[in-house]
Amino acid sequence: MASKEIIFDQKARDAILKGVNTLADAVKVTLGPKGRNVVIEKSFGSPTITKDGVTVAKEIELENKFENMGAQMVKEVASKTSDVAGDGTTTATVLAQALYREGSKLVAAGHNPMEIKRGIDKAVEIIVGELKKLSKPTKDQKEIAQVGIISANGDETIGNIIAEAMEKVGKEGVITVEEAKGLETTLEVVEGMQFDRGYLSPYFVTDAERMVANLEDAYILIHEKKISNMKDLLPLLEQIARSGKPLLIVAEEVEGEALATLVVNKLRGTLHVAAVKAPGFGDRRKAMLEDIAILTGGRMIAEELGLKLEQVSLKDLGRAKRISIDKDNTTIVDGAGQKADIEARVKTIRAQIEETTSDYDREKLQERLAKLVGGVAVINVGAATETEMKEKKARVEDALHATRAAVEEGIVPGGGVAYLRAVKALEGVKVSEGEKFGLDIVRRALEEPLRQIAGNGGYEASIVVNKVKESKDTNFGFNAATGDYEDLVKSGVIDPTKVSRSALQNASSVASLMLTTMALVAEKPKEESAAPAGGGMGGMGGMGGMM
């Protein structure tokens, strides 16, 4: 095991502070509508130009191991806030820096860090409660668009497209972001249920020009196992042929004799049929097949449910007005499922979303929910160059997260003003003498986002903060984009409450941990030993004993 280097107390806190400042100073220049750009070198390809705090934070790695620990802890603040709320990463970094900077001065002066930590925790709890009181639900599409515009660094096109997407698919719909082929950023809404499995054979295609199989008013067979034997399928195919309706087969796999027979009958015109693989894997596949069955009013054919393929009749099949299948996707529109059954299924999935602890599972459950209720919207992001495309796509994803957060927990006035207004809740709070310092640190730190926004815009930060503080109007603040003092909610400068709350909670959590740190342990750098000088071919004597 390599030997370690350990530093204690003030020396440790100074190293952390230096790391925190290095990272935060690089990140905070991006804050606000007049935030500056940061250019990041890439080992290959062109450099990345960004105004996104978390992108800058993720790139920073410091040479000094102890300073790097401080930087990495603040990076954690940015990443966590981005994961939870999708935005507010720069604000969280600014808050963490301010809390730690002020706190470390007090600890250096001999105050008890544990009392300061308790004070910070109490203050943050009160401020979060006050932010929730200040919060208002998003009323209309316009407000949702404004949240998107701010999060996308002032890009109106992005904000409006996201608001339109949310209106079309509802707040539980799935909105995905893809790269477009052209320069335009467009919105495409898929009605009904779509899953990422295409036709098993191109011979099923009905529209040769677009390479799509369209089935109108079709039956749907939902089978969880492979179908390879034709004789199991024959009784059902005879019933389908008599009914004259198209059939879609969704199964784990359709292969061999069964697939060949379907293709031959399709080409002869005896049957109008198509087959696709079931979506998902393992247990998730079973759940998705159940979803399709409920949406279309059919039954999932599974032996464990006592249903065999040869016993299936038309009443066991699902129905849909229209089915469209291309080589990658299948879309089922207007399924014949009972409304009550679909609602019961939706309720079950919602309960699972509440219970799950895995982000991945939650995302997949959310997708299933959207397919049953709302639909799916795809935002195709267009740009002129690869670099611009990456940057724009990241902004769209940020804005999408922020608008979701706004719909979830409501909005507060933006531009760092909500924090200033929430500070009044700390007046008259009864705490011990040591904890009072923690309250004061939070009080000072909450001015920092507004100071930084004003500073980045080229305005005098102290004057701006004092002018905003003087007003009793909750929504009155400084609009750095125009340089005006106005009602921020009316002028569209708003932040999702979830973003403001998460930024403060994550920043205070990490700042408190760093304040109560007394020692840092890191591996000693290995001393590179100089390579021994090459000694030529000497030393080859003494070989005479060899036979």
UniProtKB/Swiss-Prot annotation:
Q: Report the protein name in the record.
A: Chaperonin GroEL 2
Q: What lineage, starting at the top, does this entry show?
A: Bacteria, Pseudomonadati, Myxococcota, Myxococcia, Myxococcales
Top-level division of the source organism's lineage = Bacteria
* EC number(s) reported in the record: 5.6.1.7
As its record notes, the protein acts as a catalyst of: ATP + H2O + a folded polypeptide = ADP + phosphate + an unfolded polypeptide
Q: Look at the named UniProt entry and state the broad enzyme category this protein falls under.
A: isomerase
- The protein's predominant localisation is cytoplasm
Question: Could you tell me which InterPro entries the record lists for this protein?
Answer: Chaperonin_Cpn60_CS, Cpn60/GroEL, Cpn60/GroEL/TCP-1, GroEL-like_apical_dom_sf, GROEL-like_equatorial_sf, TCP-1-like_intermed_sf
GO CC, sorted alphabetically, is: cytoplasm
